[in-house]
């Protein structure tokens, strides 16, 4: 999420690779999770040179001035269980920082992060002027030292909540010299393209795992016994309802939706009748994340036994671009 660190500090502006350079490293997946299942690609490098933001596919899965690739965990409970950050390519550790607290910048009492936006971080030199920088690492989790040689896929730390971030994720910046490189489309002179395959600097396995999701993605989905908010989802999700719970609620938290998208969530009972439905107005702008829930109070005598179903869809120009169905048996 945060801009890159140079001597573990922020660079003021994004500069993209534009000149011939030594052969770049091939980047393996830099985190020990399964993208699309227990982690998701939240943000790309901002390739727009102006005041707007745009990713390599001409989409909005980035924000102004963003200089790296953000891979987020599904919630903070996953961070607390521990997820390793991996060296993306062979190299030598040249800089690191530890000791920054794991706390959201939105949390009451969060310390200032100016000049330390990366939080706890590790910079690895891959030769030929190429570097990768891993940010927002968990305090006390760094397993390498300056001068140490590392192999691709070697654990170097764990995902944390340090620095300029609101949610647990790995921010990976790629540089050649002082210039930031988009690993999905390394040619700085190349215009964004909706047809770009995004293979870039990645190994074939990493490119497949990090494939672009134009319709966004479902980060969390489940059932609850009452209203749902982001704090409850981050903590691992609200309690699952039972037949005598105060209410039966279905919820979905999605990421990377576009302005104009219409999220729809429907809750259906065992008899096939709709219990509740939520259809949002078209989103006024692109949303990094969007939480929706729908439900109904428990009737006298409790919920009838059977299979309860939730159907979620995101409509774009009246066509579904994202869908998820999930069930609960009571």
Q: Which positions does each model-derived feature cover?
A:
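Beta-strand-rich binding/interaction modules
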Residues: 259-267
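A short tyrosine-centered beta-strand micro-motif
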Residues: 304-315
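Short histidine-centered loop motifs in beta-beta connectors
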Residues: 79-82, 86, 126, 130-153
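Conserved, short, structured surface segments that act as functional micro-motifs
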Residues: 71, 110-125, 137, 148-213
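Aromatic sugar-binding surface patches on proteins
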Residues: 284-298
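Solvent-exposed serine/threonine-rich low-complexity stretches and specific carbohydrate-binding patches
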Residues: 275-286
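Short beta-strand elements
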Residues: 319-330
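Surface-exposed, glycine-biased beta-strand/turn segments
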Residues: 20-119, 152, 194-247, 251-256
